[in-house]
């Protein structure tokens, strides 16, 4: 039944628009939280000012989301915010700065060690989101923000957006605590970086440990773990599809 509702509502443009708006708003607010935390801890006044300016731009895009009349506009605000966010991403790296310099997000292939970390850990999050969609009866391939493509888990990609900043924080922790180092990577011609097999196993362990950490869910008003959040959000999404909730309520990181 829930998949029938999902398929039907994925064809309703107004419903898709509201879902996409909520998803992106949640992601951008969580990105803002990451940068706000960095700004509070930064001792470099120039960097702190750059971060505050980036936060201001993201906050402006959050407010513009409310007036967006198309999914394309929402994607535009998300894309602009992502560019702003990643423009100050390097300031969040305190240790091993030279070895883990970050200039911009590159995916296929990852052209820095930090990009390789992000891509690998995002892929673990994607797999978790596919699993929780299936667990609550949703079709992970029928999305609302992301268009459907053959073999693309569009709904899982939708669901993971608000959790990407959690991965970003984990990456900063691993680098700044020197739990990941240059020796964990292979560099190929063209400045293409890959994580070696043994280090991938260690990263999976770090990811699983992060998932065990307790966190408070403000809307549900319960204590949870980081790993349970995608499942809880998938259930909220299912309730939205059934009509129990008027809008999808993303997880906002306090």
Curated annotation (Swiss-Prot):
Coiled coil: none annotated. Its cofactor is Mg(2+); Mn(2+). Disulfide bonds: none annotated. Homodimer, forms a heterotetramer with a Cas2 homodimer. Belongs to the CRISPR-associated endonuclease Cas1 family. CRISPR (clustered regularly interspaced short palindromic repeat), is an adaptive immune system that provides protection against mobile genetic elements (viruses, transposable elements and conjugative plasmids). CRISPR clusters contain spacers, sequences complementary to antecedent mobile elements, and target invading nucleic acids. CRISPR clusters are transcribed and processed into CRISPR RNA (crRNA). Acts as a dsDNA endonuclease. Involved in the integration of spacer DNA into the CRISPR cassette. This is CRISPR-associated endonuclease Cas1. It comes from Leptospira interrogans serogroup Icterohaemorrhagiae serovar Lai (strain 56601).
